[in-house]
UniProtKB/Swiss-Prot annotation:
Pfam families hit by this protein: Actin (PF00022)
SUPFAM superfamilies: Actin-like ATPase domain
SMART domains to which the protein is assigned, alphabetical: ACTIN
PANTHER family: ACTIN
Similarity comment: Belongs to the actin family.
Chief site of localization: cytoplasm
The protein, known as: Actin, cytoplasmic
Processing after translation: Met-1 may be removed after translation.
GO molecular function: ATP binding; hydrolase activity
Cited function: Actins are highly conserved proteins that are involved in various types of cell motility and are ubiquitously expressed in all eukaryotic cells.
Catalytic reaction(s) noted: ATP + H2O = ADP + phosphate + H(+)
Keywords: ATP-binding, Cytoplasm, Cytoskeleton, Hydrolase, Nucleotide-binding
Record-level GO cellular component terms: cytoplasm; cytoskeleton
């Protein structure tokens, strides 16, 4: 077992967060996208590598390339010298876990590995072992009930509605205002507008009426070319999509409040109170101002009146998963949890199902 610092790598649906155990924040945060440039001549003098990582690349994710980039470019470490904690989405297929394990031991020759469920780490980052995590990233939103450190798989819910959908939706709203954002570079501008200016209204109808009657919600945003655009009700209409997917954009999906409520209702009646009192927000798409208060209001409307609902929206929730991993692997009691190289050589990749529950 190596005495070297543990590397913690959170493979998000849109962004990789990587760093070292015991630290408060990841050292590297970058898009988890691999692709080939469309226009090679435009890249002459940049880097002749045929594949690269970054916001311009679309869809082609090669996990091997992402991990190579993480170790050698971002963290500048030799993976065979460091124990590695990887994260995975809830309900990830067993074959995925085995493939991750195989790559880490056979390609990167790591001395030790642990694979943890993202939502469980989010809960640990808040010092809890029981609660329900509403984790909204770039590509997917999950609600994951956890009891005494173990997720309850049959009650996990997911929707394909997350950050990139909100970016596309905001671009659509801005088109109605006469601003056109269509290329991938322009969508990056929209993402920045979304992250800087959008918020969740506690009462959507009331905010909409106020926006018609006054200019109180209007804000200016300077584009890279110096042009200034003004946005108003789009600031709260965009994230309203999470709460009203059908009404806002014609998608028949559960809202985040219904997703959370359904997950709780799928759990044993004896644990529901604990879940209602520990609703944890996690992931970049939960960073909107006002989202915690609104989710609380929506869940209170659904929960039994005798229950005191609590939503926890910590300021660093964008990195909650990573921080949970950093905290967990720093505990002295964690030393026995690792899958070692010896374990792998003896049992093969299936050892991950026994040691990482």
């Amino acid at each position: 077992m190596s005495d070297q610092q543990t590397c913690v790598i959170d493979n998000g649906s849109g962004v990789v967060k990587a760093g070292f155990a015991g630290e408060d924040a990841p050292r590297a945060v970058f898009p988890s996208i691999v692709g080939r440039p469309k226009n090679v001549s435009a890249l002459i003098g940049v880097d002749s590598a045929s594949e690269y990582l970054g916001d311009e690349a679309q869809q082609k994710r090669g996990v091997l390339k992402i991990w190579n980039h993480t170790f050698y470019v971002e963290l500048r470490v030799q993976p065979d010298e460091h124990p590695i904690l990887l994260t995975e989405a809830p309900l990830s297929p067993k074959t995925n876990r085995e493939k991750m394990t195989q790559i880490m031991f056979e390609t990167f020759n790591v001395p030790a590995l642990y694979v943890a469920i993202q939502a469980v780490l989010s809960l640990y980052s808040r010092g809890r072992t029981t609660g329900i995590v509403c984790d909204a990233g770039d590509g997917v939103t999950h609600t994951v009930p956890i009891y005494e450190g173990f997720s309850i798989p049959h009650a996990v819910s997911r929707i394909q509605l997350a950050g990139r959908d909100l970016t596309t939706f905001l671009a659509k709203l801005l088109t109605e205002r006469g601003y056109n954002f269509t290329s991938s570079a322009e969508l990056e501008i929209v993402r920045d507008i979304k992250e800087k200016l959008c918020f969740v209204a506690l009462n959507y109808e009331s905010a909409l009426k106020q926006s018609h009657d006054s200019s109180q919600f209007e804000k200016n945003y300077e584009l890279p070319d110096g042009k200034v655009i003004t946005i108003g009700s789009e600031r709260f209409r965009c994230p309203e999509y999470l709460f009203k997917p059908l009404e806002m954009n014609g998608r028949e999906l559960d809202s985040i409040q219904d997703l959370t409520y359904k997950s709780i209702q799928e759990c044993d009646v004896d644990v529901r109170r604990d879940l209602y009192q520990n609703i944890i927000l996690s992931g970049g798409t939960t960073m909107y101002e006002g989202i915690g208060e609104r989710l609380l209001k929506e869940i209170e409307n659904r929960a039994p009146k005798s229950i005191n609902v609590k939503v926890i929206a910590s300021p660093d929730r964008r990195f909650a998963v990573w921080r949970g991993g950093s905290t967990l692997t720093s505990l002295s009691t964690f030393a026995s949890m690792w899958i070692t190289k010896e374990d792998y050589d003896e049992n093969g990749a299936s050892i991950v199902h026994r040691k990482c529950i």
